[in-house]
């Protein structure tokens, strides 16, 4: 507020020193002072309600990340399982009873398919266990610490105290109850006087 009056005062001083006061026509606006007051009053009390981050916030992040990674493992496991079961195996041995030919590439290929089945099952189990554990952790992470409960109670008391001091207007004013606000009790003419 003082910085605004200093700048306004310095502008008037410059206008006076430059050769006289210039007359202004119209309505003066004091909106800049109103908004300065509002923002100052809002930011004065901001520090009162700051709350430190609790360890529960980190556990919340932990279970969410675990749930997402568990979901990824389940999807990856299902994909690898599908590859292991849906890709047809190759024939390893062919021939007659007395003469059998074994294809070593087919044996390795079929071994890789079996490995895919096993890896898919393991990934699916790890992902499912991770998801179940993280869902349980989310349920148990809802319990608040004593400090956080105390801060919440203190915040609620302050809000209740503020509401108790500011009482809303519940009845309409009667015919004799009307009063002019102090700021409007004196009317000051800001229009220039007409010379004619």
UniProtKB/Swiss-Prot annotation:
Q: Which family does it belong to?
A: Belongs to the VMP family.
Residue stretches spanning the membrane: 67-87, 121-141
Q: What is the membrane topology here?
A: Multi-pass membrane protein
Q: In which tissues is it expressed?
A: Expressed predominantly in brain. Also weakly expressed in lung and spleen. In brain, expressed strongly in nerve fibers of the cerebral cortex, anterior cerebral nuclei, hypothalamus, amygdaloid complex, brain stem of the metaencephalon and medulla oblongata, and moderately expressed in soma of neurons of the dentate gyrus of the hippocampus and Purkinje cells of the cerebellum.
Chain's gene name = Nrsn1
Gene Ontology CC, one term: membrane
- Name of the protein in question: Neurensin-1
State its location(s).
Membrane; Cell projection, Neuron projection
Organism, as annotated: Mus musculus (Mouse)
